[in-house]
Amino acid sequence: MTARRAPAVNRDVLERMLVDGAASLDVALSDTQRNRLLDYVALLGKWNAVYNLTAIRDPQQMLIQHILDSLSIVPHLRGRASARVLDVGSGGGLPGLVLAIVEPDWQVTLNDIVQKKSAFQTQTRAELKLTNLSVVTGRVETLRPGVEVPEKFDIIVSRAFADLSDFVKLARHLVAPGGSIWAMKGVHPDDEIARLPEGSRVKQTMRLAVPMLDAERHLIEVAVDEAI
């Protein structure tokens, strides 16, 4: 499959939504980054017709619920000149693909167990020329630094992977010293936090405000003893 741009009128509408949304999040986008994000929406819509990557079909809702939702975490993750990032259960590439676009100095790895999703991620990487992005297929708990992945990660993030306690249990062996696990959630996950495994703790909880989306969003940062 090759990238297909959305019809001009639709792309213009999406571009205005993206520009306004990114500005409200205090995320500056270059022309290249903006165009890559819009091309990503077009690719996601095209592949979704065949591979069912997301339940959201409308391009404007894709932009809000996928792109802007992913961009909303960027200000909280920044502060590193470079970072190694693992996106667990990435699906259609969220949020990792968005992070790779807006943070070109970060090395981002997308992980999923479904081959067709990895195929979409790989194709999107090629079409958008994201040299800082890699894709690995398999269960996160089986990934080994120096084997399936090059090394441990400073940031391990997930948007829709699992219960927080399960996420921490499965991914904690991949956290680099000084690194953290970051979970994107809807309503504040009090019950999930209460079930966090021994040797892990919440460092901070942030309420996210996603432009044009009337829904609760939270970002939870978890530290694990292995990364101290």
From Swiss-Prot:
Keywords: Cytoplasm, Methyltransferase, rRNA processing, S-adenosyl-L-methionine, Transferase. PANTHER family: S-ADENOSYL-L-METHIONINE-DEPENDENT METHYLTRANSFERASES SUPERFAMILY PROTEIN. Its EC number is 2.1.1.170. It comes from the Bacteria. NCBIfam families: rsmG_gidB. This is Ribosomal RNA small subunit methyltransferase G. Signal peptide: none annotated. It is found in: Cytoplasm. S-adenosyl-L-methionine binds at G89, L94, V140, E141, R159. It catalyses: guanosine(527) in 16S rRNA + S-adenosyl-L-methionine = N(7)-methylguanosine(527) in 16S rRNA + S-adenosyl-L-homocysteine. The keyword Transferase applies. GO terms for molecular function: rRNA (guanine-N7-)-methyltransferase activity. Pfam families: GidB. It is an enzyme of class 2 (transferase). Specifically methylates the N7 position of guanine in position 527 of 16S rRNA. One of its GO terms (cellular component) is cytosol. Belongs to the methyltransferase superfamily. RNA methyltransferase RsmG family.
